[in-house]
């Protein structure tokens, strides 16, 4: 009887924590841009500047911190949509990369989101951007894992393609 009660309590605890049991998902997008690495880095390096090149965001405002210092918090506002906060985790100007996380809870179908963004030398005359993240599906069953990954990849693709078009036309 005691084993049955312990077993039932264990199952109840596991069932009541579905988000914790979900595995991490990964999204990634890359793009090659035919401009110098310095021009690309200059366009993307400011933690509070995503809305200047990503058309999905209408505003990007620093709440605390600043000057690309780890711990800086920004509020992102989706065009005609919700707002959510992100924290800068690391910033390396020399290697042209930074990482950040979405502060949970956020009005998005994800949780535990951590992302890295890096600008590197590409093939001759090109610069490559690498945008990667890991996260959990937090859509309450409304989206399959593949759909959530597609949602994030599509957001990356829209931003990177807009950046490419803008920089290559200057």
Where are these regions (language model features)?
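Hydrophobic ligand-binding cavity/cleft-lining segments
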Residues: 19-64
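Amphipathic hydrophobic-ligand
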Residues: 23, 109-116
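A conserved amphipathic terminal alpha-helix motif
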Residues: 128, 134-170
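Sec-dependent N-terminal signal peptides
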Residues: 4-15
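Stable alpha-helical elements in mature extracytoplasmic
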Residues: 36-37, 43-46, 84, 148, ...
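Hydrophobic/aromatic beta-strand elements that line small-molecule binding cavities or substrate pockets
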Residues: 29-31, 84-90, 114-121
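Glycine-rich portal/gate segments that line the openings of hydrophobic small-molecule binding cavities
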Residues: 52, 61-107, 165-170
């Amino acid at each position: 009887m005691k084993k049955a009660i312990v077993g039932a309590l264990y199952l109840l605890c596991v069932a009541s924590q579905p988000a914790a049991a979900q595995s991490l998902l990964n999204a990634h997008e890359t793009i090659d841009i035919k401009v110098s690495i310095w021009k690309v880095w200059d366009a993307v390096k400011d933690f509070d500047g995503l809305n200047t090149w990503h058309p999905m965001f209408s505003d990007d405002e620093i709440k605390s911190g600043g000057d690309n210092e780890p711990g800086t918090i920004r509020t992102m506002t989706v065009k005609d949509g919700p707002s959510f906060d992100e924290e800068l985790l690391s910033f390396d100007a020399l290697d042209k990369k930074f990482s950040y996380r979405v502060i949970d809870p956020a009005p998005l179908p994800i949780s535990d989101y951590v992302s890295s963004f890096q600008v590197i030398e590409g093939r001759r005359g090109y610069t490559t951007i690498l945008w990667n993240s890991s996260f959990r599906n937090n859509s309450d069953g409304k989206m399959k894992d593949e759909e959530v990954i597609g949602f994030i990849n599509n957001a990356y693709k829209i931003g990177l393609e807009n950046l490419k078009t803008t920089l290559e036309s200057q």
